[in-house]
Regions:
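Short "domain-exit" segments at the C-terminal end of structured domains
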Residues: 413-418
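RNA/tRNA-interacting regions in translation and RNA-turnover enzymes
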Residues: 1-408, 412
Length: 418
């Protein structure tokens, strides 16, 4: 086999410097490496031995950079995103911001249509009993599932994001969550009683076993995903042990939904269970993102040969959110910031952010993914970001001092003392 070697002067991820030496009288110019000594782990390379050298395979070119051959040479950016910018908890969201910042065009990925001649609506029904807690529920189905390891490019990208690759189906859901910021869940279709999904509140003291094998005691404030007979998932947090994907799965139901953020946060705390999915849901997701995410997942399933996507989509969207419209108030923005930015310049900033201006009634139409833009000060903040914080003049707080009048207490106090 072909293995990686560290030469004299190289350092391991632990900081140990590799030096020339002699081993049993034979001169050694370096050290052959295990996967851990290359800065990775068996979590991301499950075929690596528990101890010993990692065989990189016959495709590895002798003399090439081992880190590059393993795909570990990629640059990883870490962003500290404030909780109000949930749209940036995804690759697409960061790309949108980067395009606006660097004056580039932002183009959403073109998702190819998927699905055979069957109709998913003939195979599953969805009933949302509480539209306030479940704003949208999208479902698609995949049959003839072929579980297998994901391709290396996907495993590497997941590993770079700190996610352990498992199999093609699980990896696709995680990959799309990173791309679109939309959590998804997969259920074994053959375990769904009556081929029916019901989104309802839990019953007080209802006990439910989650995927991690733990029994959770619920109450009526928590939202459940159920079939015709039983609960199969704790909405937005974790699926159930009774509907999990196993190696024997043949047909799968994909779920992409938009649950109420405050409810998910409270439910996760009550259940003592916080997951990557609940962490995203609790910040409040864009309901219009669910459809694109589930279609992207189905595109990847066909692309990777992981199964046959059934045509159509079940889409329950009880109450579509009203479009947010704010008045365009450039004078107020400048007053708040202490700047003198022209109206035209402000509108250029807003256009980059996909905020549409309606000249007829002087209003700004806020895109659904910008849930943080609610009032005048929020719009002023957007102006400040693109105008440049460094250009905003530094001024000290000022106020007008007046002598004022003495209160009755101050007037009467000297009299009393006399």
């Amino acid at each position: 086999g072909r293995v990686a070697g560290g030469h004299d002067g190289s350092r391991t991820p632990g900081g140990i410097k590799i030096k020339k030496g002699k081993l049993r009288g034979i001169e050694s110019d370096g050290m052959m490496c295990s996967i851990e000594e290359l800065g990775s782990s068996r979590d991301y390379y499950p075929d690596a031995p528990e101890s010993g050298l990692y065989d990189m395979g016959q495709d590895a070119v002798v003399g090439s950079d081992a880190i590059e051959a393993l795909g570990l040479h990629d640059v990883v950016f870490e962003y500290e995103i404030t909780s109000n910018r949930v749209d940036c908890y995804s690759i697409i969201g960061i790309a949108r911001e980067a395009a606006a910042t660097f004056h580039k065009d932002f183009v959403l990925p073109d998702i190819k249509p998927t699905g055979n001649n069957e109709n998913v609506n003939d195979m599953i029904s969805v009933d949302v009993e509480d539209g306030d807690l479940c704003k949208r529920y999208c479902a698609r189905m995949v049959k003839n599932i072929k579980l297998a390891p994901s391709p290396e490019w996907m495993q590497r990208r997941l590993a770079a994001s700190g996610i352990r690759p498992i199999n093609n189906i699980v990896d696709i859901t995680n990959y799309v969550m990173e791309e679109y910021g939309q959590p998804m869940h997969a259920y074994d279709y053959d375990t769904i009683a009556d081929h029916k999904i019901v989104v309802r509140r839990a019953k007080d003291k209802e006990v439910f076993c989650t995927l991690d094998g733990q029994d959770r005691t619920l109450d009526s404030s928590m939202l459940m995903i159920c079939d015709g007979e039983k609960a199969i998932g704790l909405a937005g947090i974790m699926g159930g042990e009774n509907s999990k994907i196993t190696d024997d799965v043949k047909t799968m139901l994909f779920e992409a939904a938009c649950f109420d953020g405050a409810n998910i946060r409270i439910s996760a705390k009550k259940a003592g269970l916080r997951t990557d999915a609940s962490g995203k849901f609790e910040k409040g997701l864009d309901p219009y993102n669910a459809e694109a995410a589930i279609n992207r997942a189905c595109e990847l399933i066909e692309e990777l040969g992981a199964g046959e996507v059934v045509g159509g989509m079940v889409d329950v969207f009880p109450v579509k959110p009203e479009e947010k419209v704010l008045p365009f108030e450039p004078d107020k923005y400048n007053k708040l910031l202490g700047t003198d930015v022209s109206s035209d310049e402000m509108l250029k900033y807003f256009d980059k952010l996909e905020i549409e201006y309606n000249e007829s009634d002087n209003t700004l139409h806020i895109p659904s993914f910008r849930q943080d833009l609610l009032r005048t000060c929020d719009m002023a903040e957007e102006v400040a970001r693109f105008y440049g914080y460094d250009k905003i003049p530094v001024t000290l707080p000022s106020g007008e001092s007046t002598s004022g009048k003495l209160s009755l207490i101050h007037i009467s106090e000297p009299t009393r003392l006399l």
